[in-house]
Swiss-Prot record:
One of its GO terms (molecular function) is lipid binding. The gene is atpK. Optimum temperature is 80 degrees Celsius. Optimum pH is 6.0 for ATP hydrolysis. It comes from Methanocaldococcus jannaschii (strain ATCC 43067 / DSM 2661 / JAL-1 / JCM 10045 / NBRC 100440) (Methanococcus jannaschii). Belongs to the V-ATPase proteolipid subunit family. This is A-type ATP synthase subunit K.
Length: 220
């Protein structure tokens, strides 16, 4: 039997490490755009900070899950802790897509302040994948798996993989959202169609979320 502390430590590391990787890249993409914007107009510094903060939330979710794992490792299934870290960490890579969208949003706002609200709407879309990962991680950590140890292991890993890998769709969603921001900046009436296109990639994240929940209900 694997020591629970080992799997808990690995799960915590995956949560904060992978999610932090995504947030670091996403924030870097937006920050690079922000540096150019501030060079042109120093008064846009506050706006640049707001947009750069958006892809950092995934890292915070990963940090939160890591802390939770370290607090509950004595009472939760060891593989559930590992899977929770996997779910939060992989889904946190959606920050890369959010950084791409936020970078485009910042560039659009630099040209026209009136588009700020619309740019924010598109920029936050890729974060939902990370929220799905956070949700499944919390459900795993509250002890939904009781009973057969072998079934617990397989189910926990299945749920973590489902929502985690499906959460990578946030990268594609961010790319689409960035294009939609550009289209909306040119033609405000294009926002509705742009939103439809931007939410399409999220369908697969929802599939992953649903399968993860069904797996947990099946084993429970």
């Amino acid at each position: 039997m694997v020591d629970p502390l080992i799997l808990g430590a690995v799960g915590a590391g995956l949560a904060v490490g992978i999610a932090g990787l995504g947030s670091g890249i996403g924030a870097g993409i937006t920050g690079a755009s922000g540096a150019g914007v501030v060079a042109e107009d120093p008064n846009k510094f506050g706006t640049a900070i707001v947009f750069q903060a958006l892809p950092q939330t995934q890292g915070l979710y990963g940090f939160l899950v890591a802390i939770l794992i370290l607090f509950v490792f004595k009472t939760v299934s060891p593989w559930a802790m590992f899977a929770a870290g996997l779910a939060a960490g992989l889904a946190g890579l959606s920050a890369i897509g959010q950084g791409i969208a936020a970078s485009a949003g910042l560039g659009a706002v630099a040209e026209d302040n009136s588009i700020f609200g619309k740019a924010m709407v598109f920029s936050v879309l890729p974060e939902t994948q990370a929220i799905y990962g956070l949700l499944i991680a919390i459900l795993l950590l509250v002890g939904v798996f009781k009973g057969n140890a072998g079934a617990e292991t397989v189910a926990a890993l299945g749920a973590g993989f489902a929502v985690g890998f499906a959460g990578l769709s946030g990268i594609g969603q961010g790319i689409t959202a960035a294009g939609a921001i550009g289209a909306t900046a040119r033609d405000p009436d294009a926002m509705g169609k742009g939103l439809v296109l931007a939410v399409m990639p999220e369908t697969f994240a929802i599939f992953g979320l649903l399968i993860a929940i069904l797996i947990m209900l099946m084993i429970k």
